[in-house]
Amino acid sequence: TSAGLTRNLLMFICDAYEEQKVADKGNDDDWRTVLHFHPVIAPITVAVLPLMKKDGLAELAQDIQAELREDFRTDYDQAGAIGKRYRRQDEAGTPFCVTVDYDSKEDGTVTLRFRDSMQQIRVPRSELSNRIRTEIKNYTRV
């Protein structure tokens, strides 16, 4: 039909797609591609990214992903530089990234990054699921 699923899907993708110029350390040609899917319809709700593969960060990140997987659609990515991993998740439309770093081992907090604003905040691991739920509930596109 003329109002079929394909047209609706294309409409969501076209509306969500954006190329943004990013201010980056003197590089005038730095762009990022973002799919601004609402968190409810994003294929991946949250990606868990260890800062490094060593020193137990990967194992800690996998534990956190297992916890988040109970409530959200998750992804785990440890390949490449953290900035490139953020960009891959932006392109996939993932609204939230959780970065596990050395402070995570020390104080039990993680970095929660927001796709649309690229803002990063520290969140206690014990409050992470609730914080993501709250962010989804209050989501407005920037």
Predicted feature locations:
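NTP/phosphate- and nucleic-acid-binding module
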Residues: T1-V142
